[in-house]
C-alpha cells in the first residue's frame, strides 16, 4: 500500500477514536456498534456507515445495522469524508487489483480498530467509556452486503472468533 494511503488510514483511525469520544452517550444501554456498507466502485472509496443499537431495540435485527436505532451516525461520516476523498484521489487511474488491495487493506484497518476498541471497553477505558454498555458489548464490521462467508470472516476479524460465536453473530 502507498505510504500516503497508509498515512490517511492512520488519520482515519484517529478520527474514529476522537469522534466516538465526542458522540454523546445514547439513551439506554448499547450492546453493539458497527461499521457497515463499505462502498467501492473502483473510482471512489466510500465512507462506511457507523451504527449502534440499544438493548430492547434488537428484535429480529440484533446484528443488522441497517435496522438499528441509529443506522448511520452522520457525524462519523462527515468527519471521515475528506480523508476518504483524499484516498480516492490517490487511487485515481489505478487498476482493479490496486483497488481490491485497498479494499482488503481497509477491512484490515477497521478490524484492528474494532479489536482495539473492544479491548479498551473490556478494561473500562477508551473513547466509549462515557457510554452505558452491556457486559458483552462489541464493536465490529457487520457488512450485510457481503456473502455469508465474507460476512462471517469480517465479523470474526473485528470482534474475535470467540465473541462472534458466543454472541451468535455467526
Show where each model-derived region lies:
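N-terminal interaction modules that seed assembly of large macromolecular complexes
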Residues: 25-62
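Short, hydrophobic/proline-enriched secondary-structure or compact coil segments at domain edges
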Residues: 35, 110, 117, 136-143
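Polybasic, proline/glycine-rich intrinsically disordered low-complexity segments
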Residues: 53-122
Amino acid at each position: 500500500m502507498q505510504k500516503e494511503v497508509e498515512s490517511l488510514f492512520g488519520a482515519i483511525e484517529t478520527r474514529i477514536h476522537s469522534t466516538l469520544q465526542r458522540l454523546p452517550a445514547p439513551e439506554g444501554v448499547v450492546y453493539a456498534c458497527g461499521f457497515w456498507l463499505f462502498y467501492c466502485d473502483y473510482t471512489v472509496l466510500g465512507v462506511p456507515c457507523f451504527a449502534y443499537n440499544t438493548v430492547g431495540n434488537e428484535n429480529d435485527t440484533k446484528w443488522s445495522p441497517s435496522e438499528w436505532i441509529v443506522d448511520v451516525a452522520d457525524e462519523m461520516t462527515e468527519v471521515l469524508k475528506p480523508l476518504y476523498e483524499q484516498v480516492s484521489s490517490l487511487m485515481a487511474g489505478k487498476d482493479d487489483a490496486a483497488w481490491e488491495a485497498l479494499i482488503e487493506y481497509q477491512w484490515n484497518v477497521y478490524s484492528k480498530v474494532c479489536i482495539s476498541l473492544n479491548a479498551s471497553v473490556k478494561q473500562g477505558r477508551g473513547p466509549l467509556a462515557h457510554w452505558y454498555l452491556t457486559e458483552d458489548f462489541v464493536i465490529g464490521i457487520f457488512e450485510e452486503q457481503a456473502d455469508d462467508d465474507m460476512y462471517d470472516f469480517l465479523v470474526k476479524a473485528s470482534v474475535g472468533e470467540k465473541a462472534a460465536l458466543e454472541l451468535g453473530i455467526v
